[in-house]
Amino acid sequence: IRKEFKESKASLANSAGIFLNKKYHFDLVRPGIALYGGNPFINKKIDLKNVINLKAKVIQIRQIQKNDTVGYGATFKAKKDMLVGTIAIGYADGINRKFSSNMCVFLDGKQLKVLGRISMDLITIDMTSLPKLKKSKKIIYVDVINKYNDINSLSKNIDTISYEVLTSLGNRYKRQYI
């Protein structure tokens, strides 16, 4: 192609190619998933900064009793009295159902476990460690994706790739680009 189009720039390296070797770079590179902090390799550690922060609003906080169940199919049964929060996000927003009981969200750096099955629009979380929030009148948001819970660690939790976690996020989010 370069013989016919002498002024054309050559490109071979996508995100993975960028980290292989400069001989793959040619005239320019095409970073994709790496722009978002996604590791293009499955078995190779690359130190990338997470640039995605996904927040979800806590729409309900309630007390449940020992042996109460949470979620469709009653997939979570409380082993003790607990404070449970419901957040306004679910699989319709691209949060894979495989994250059911297999994920945490964060509030002020504190890890809160997902309880039970992720539903279409809602996820329940364990807020027992934050009892003062039960009576709070403040609007509360939790971090679903952040520096502790980036697309690379989330993808490992459900045996997929960071591309899938990122591209599954739907169009129901208010996006803010900084």
Language-model regions: role of each:
Residues 1-178:
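Active-site anion/phosphate-binding pocket segments in diverse small-molecule metabolic enzymes
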